[in-house]
Amino acid sequence: MRNIICLFTFFSIILPLSLSPAFASEKESVMILELSTGIVKIRLRDDLAPKHVERMKQLADLKFYDNIIFHRVIDGFMAQTGDPTGTGMGGSDYPDLRAEFSPEPFLRGTIGMARSRHPDSANSQFFICLEDAEFLNRQYTVFAEVIEGMEHVDAIAKGEPPEKPDYIVTMRPADTDDE
């Protein structure tokens, strides 16, 4: 009888937790970044940068990133995108974001917000680290990480700007079809 009570108690606690928003939001925090080079899955890190994650979701919902080129791709460093003008000088119509620096290191596959010299100037541009770039730690906002498809990021044409730039086909939330 004691075992039955223990099992009942265990399942009455675990089952509701597994249906809680925390578990649901894990699915919501994965985005599909469809590039001209292939599909990349990214995990948004709202535990590190909630305002930046909110902005990325907002812009993705508006299809802001669709067909935007990678305008700055430095071999052994990073691939930058998110500027609708393709020059590195543009952004969205939304106000710039305050920095959300964290101790999270910039490693291969880390995604950070690009900005000007002013720490609170991030808007829509972001970069994906092609290699570790720990010299950026605590100077740029980490808001996501590549969890699948890094080979497609590696295949992005290099240059500032590249002669034939690769681009974002679309950015969207992951759904069950993406599993």
Residue ranges and their predicted role:
Residues 6-12, 19-179:
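Cyclophilin-like peptidyl-prolyl cis-trans isomerases
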